[in-house]
Amino acid sequence: MKNIVFMGTPDYASVILEAILKNGGYNVVAVFTQPDRPVGRKAILTPPEVKKTVLQSGLDIPIFQPLNLKDSSTVNDIKALKPNFIVVAAYGQILPKDILDIAPCINLHASLLPKFRGASPIQEAILRGELLSGVTAMRMGVGLDDGDILGFSVIEIPNLKSSQLFCELAKMAAKLTIKILNEFESISPIAQFHALSSKCGKVHKEDGLIDIKLQTPKIIESKFRAYYPWPGLYLENGVKIWDMEISNLKGENGYVLSIDYDGFTIGVNGGSIKIKSLQESGKKMVNAKDYINGKRLGVGSKFC
């Protein structure tokens, strides 16, 4: 039975880890994940999803949460585990060469490489209006997501939110992981075409801010899907939009153009959007009709 060291942090990685644990053909000798972080207004110390998965499994798998993989003690810990493979999925740290040299390191990246190397490939694919996305399994090198390709899976992504695409790609990545592990010795890796590469950085809260005077309905709708549920889509007045769609009405930016049973429409640059649910800062989410009634807004009223 092959020994695996698994490295990952969010839900996406948990789905992959669960598939390896259920497969029965591999022995997960250790899991590396990010440290517990304070979450929410009360700053409750919360473990990452991968750690939760290990604890809930009831299996006696050592969990490591180092701040830095470059520490010599961490490298020695991994060497002592004698892994046949190191499987990496959205871990959150770059692996140093000392670890890459221990065993084949296989990364499951949530894009069709060489497109969208980096921290936010799912969000970036939606923002760019891509029709296809997918998962790429690669043999990791010292560069950022630039290793040789071992295999990939593809999915059509029109109209998907990032949360939905995360779920779909996680399931695809789980199946691809088992396939690559089973067939690793017979796979001929393919070098990436680096001239076609693109990069994407971490998503920040301010990325969800929209300017209705400058951004078109299509751009706003793409940002809504890309940043759902976090950081979300919000206006300069602090209102967060939880559900929306593009409208075909025309009118003045920021003003209410129409009201119906499931929302209200406001003018934006080059068109309009229909808001169906929203949330004021410090308050609960409400449906748009209740918001309009509570604020006593009507057609022609200024919303933002």
Swiss-Prot record:
Parts forming coiled coils: none
Keyword field: Protein biosynthesis, Transferase
Any one GO molecular function term: methionyl-tRNA formyltransferase activity
Superkingdom to which the source organism belongs: Bacteria
Binding site for (6S)-5,6,7,8-tetrahydrofolate: S111, L112, L113, P114
Catalytic activity, reaction form: L-methionyl-tRNA(fMet) + (6R)-10-formyltetrahydrofolate = N-formyl-L-methionyl-tRNA(fMet) + (6S)-5,6,7,8-tetrahydrofolate + H(+)
One GO cellular component term: cytosol
Stretch forming the signal peptide: none
EC number: 2.1.2.9
Protein family per UniProt: Belongs to the Fmt family.
Role this protein plays: Attaches a formyl group to the free amino group of methionyl-tRNA(fMet). The formyl group appears to play a dual role in the initiator identity of N-formylmethionyl-tRNA by promoting its recognition by IF2 and preventing the misappropriation of this tRNA by the elongation apparatus.
Protein name: Methionyl-tRNA formyltransferase
Lineage: Bacteria, Pseudomonadati, Campylobacterota, Epsilonproteobacteria, Campylobacterales
Gene name of this polypeptide: fmt
